[in-house]
Regions:
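Residue-level marker of intrinsically disordered, low-complexity segments enriched
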Residues: 1-2, 10, 71, 124, ...
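C-terminal engagement/docking regions of AAA+ P-loop ATPases
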Residues: 14-25, 221-236, 246-283
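Walker A/P-loop NTP-binding motif of AAA+ ATPase domains
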Residues: 15-223, 229, 241
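Interdomain "pre-motor" coupling segment immediately N-terminal to P-loop NTPase/helicase cores
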Residues: 1-20
């Protein structure tokens, strides 16, 4: 690893995905966010000469909104469709209790990204490490924020560096103002609307061969009743519903039961409490 401290580089390489294999079509809903990311990241890769001057792509994108709505999945999809190396970095991987280690880790991260470019550095829960500065900040925290800004500026100011930093947060207003300025492109990933909820429910059930016995009318009723649910909530509900037929099997027969023998899911006649969606709606 060129110009990288092996102590920190080896750990960061574990979080590098050469190709994610995720496509934008794998993400249900989030249409406006997908269009914005395609315009900001994928199209410039297809024709770099066209995207110059005022059309030059940004080097920092902030994905924000309620948790569980596909921020990480979207970032992986963008990396895959633009053929860029993807670094999936958590806040914990950048912090350290030892003075100086956090700064060295950040320097190593950006250097590895330079060596592997074009690259996308995705930092989940970025607010936990780059929150607004206050008197309560420790010396380690202040130094880490400063180092991140230095490395970020270095990567974005050098025209030869093809590094994109994508941050994800549920609390954008907690971010330091200096950090926000470095993410000029800000994309909201809100809770899915009724149409997106229907699409996600159907896609999930069809993918796992569990749609037989249901119809679009059934799922549209459920989509209407699940307002306020996130993408991950809906997937969790499908998983819970998938367990309902298993619970009806006699325990003595469970070990020899074949999946093809399980009864299909069905929608019950009344939906009184969507909080218990799997048991009351699909069962």
């Amino acid at each position: 690893m060129k110009c990288v401290d092996a102590k920190f580089g080896d750990r960061l390489l574990d979080e590098m995905l050469d190709r994610t294999g995720v496509r934008l079509s794998d993400v249900a809903g989030c249409e406006s966010a997908k269009e914005a990311l395609e315009e900001a990241v994928i199209l410039p890769v297809m024709n770099p000469k066209l995207f110059s001057g005022l059309r030059q792509p940004v080097k920092g994108i902030l994905l924000f909104g309620p948790p569980g709505n596909g921020k990480t999945l979207l970032a992986k999809a963008v990396a895959s469709e633009s053929n860029q190396v993807f670094f999936n970095i958590s806040a914990a991987s950048l912090t350290s209790k030892w003075v100086g280690d956090a700064e060295k880790t950040i320097r190593s991260l950006f250097q590895i990204a330079r060596n592997a470019q074009p690259a996308i550095i995705f930092i989940d829960e970025i607010d936990s490490i780059l929150c607004d500065r206050s008197e309560k900040d420790t010396e380690v925290s202040r130094r880490m924020k400063t180092e991140f800004l230095i490395q970020f500026d270095g990567a974005t100011s050098n025209p030869d560096d093809r590094i994109l930093v994508i941050g994800a947060t549920n609390r954008p207003y907690d971010l330091d103002d200096a950090v926000l300025r470095r993410f000029p492109k800000r994309i909201l990933l809100d809770l899915p609307d009724e149409s997106a909820r229907f699409t996600l429910l159907k896609t999930t059930l069809v993918k796992h061969n569990m749609y037989e016995g249901l119809d679009d009318y059934d799922l549209r009723r459920i989509a209407q009743q699940t307002e306020g649910y996130s993408n991950s909530d809906l997937v969790a509900l499908c998983k819970e519903a998938a367990m309902v037929p298993v619970r009806s099997i006699d325990r003595k027969k469970l070990a020899s039961c074949d999946e093809s023998k399980l009864r299909n899911l069905r929608v019950c006649s009344s939906i009184k409490n969507v909080a218990n969606f799997s048991e009351r709606a699909m069962c």
